[in-house]
């Protein structure tokens, strides 16, 4: 599939004009060094310039893909590759084994657990049931040292914002604990499993969330 993509790109690149990315002079001094960054304006992702840039890039991409004569064959090859069982590297915590499994038909892999070496596997967490439309995904997990609790974060609609929850591993029930507005953060359990460390932000303004 990768070879087909490269060939199709070389055949069509000359027929397209890439959207320009404006360079806006900007510099700042950081620890005694002057940093030049002509694309700093892109960091304001809610600005009119940024949203216009994203729209032009998306339009260019869709125009290219739409005219790609290998589109259907590539999609067919990818479906064949993905339509198969897959299992992640298992890991153990306090003699319990955890791993992700997908039979090829699920949108998201399920988190499985074996409570002991001789025990049968069971589904610990099924992110496919988080929402009916499949827009809520499992982002990351962290098992407590005694393997009694699972901290897991979810993402809604592909957002970088994460909501952390805690699952009782034995009962499979989600506890009332809930941490919102986390981003780019893991969960590190205390040695005595009394809690875990994480990073979060203040709740964004409604205006920012709408954008």
Where are these regions (language model features)?
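Beta-propeller folds
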Residues: 8-211
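Bacterial N-terminal signal peptides
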Residues: 1-7
